[in-house]
Amino acid sequence: KERFLIMNLILDDGYQFGLGAFETIPVYQGRPVWLEAHERRLRHTLEYLGIDLSSDWENHLWEYVYGMDKEDWVLKKITSDKNINFTSRANLYASMADRPGYVIALSSIRRNETSPLVRHKTFNYGDSILAKRQARAEGIDEPIFCNMQGQLTEGAVSNLFFIKNGRLYTPPVEAGLLPGIIRSYLCQCYDVIEKPLYPEDIRTFDECFLTNSLMGLMPVRRFGTVAFPVSSETQTAALFRRYEADKSLPFPFSIRRAGERPGRPCPSR
């Protein structure tokens, strides 16, 4: 059941026109995971929208967190010009051991790579929500968007990764996507190749997975008609185990592991 904390909600430009931002943060053992990274991204978006973040937001956040009677849950912070609100809910993503792998497919909706809003986590999520609903009705776990040039970008609520010959590949931010927190983590921990990718490239890769802050890393077993392996022996599974060990550490990581192959432990930091 979702729990809300509404603090004198005012119908400002955020709630009337979408000029607001939010962050969805997993809480693990009573602590928000990589809160600093989420707050940094939130501040960046609010600055772009011309919104000042309240000086006492952190006190409200911790008051809300400490008021919860459970250790593992999802915290959502919703911010606009005149509002700061929090909600909580359960994290419904299964553990890696119980994950059969996602089935994903291309959406008919295109990402507009020329829009600056696509790179920010704003209230403007209509395309993603509608595409997600349609995909689920068709038995698809996550729709994947191409941009106006036909390049792969991201999922409705996830970033997209591939593995080929032990190397990680992901579309660049310039393709028109939100730079996710787990995406940033992987790009700092491993020598990720960011390059334009097209639908015809999908079948050339060995593995595929999605990322976001709640799922961590989600293996993909089928992308359209292309099947990928899903097991505890894949490099995707090894990456997930590394993430599970790392998520209790501070973010960001200061060392980029050039040449580090997926699945190998990151050097001590």
Positions of the model-derived regions?
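Helix-start/capping segments and mature chain N-termini
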Residues: 2-53, 59-66, 83-260, 266-269
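Ordered, amphipathic secondary-structure segments that act as subunit-interaction surfaces
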Residues: 70-81, 85
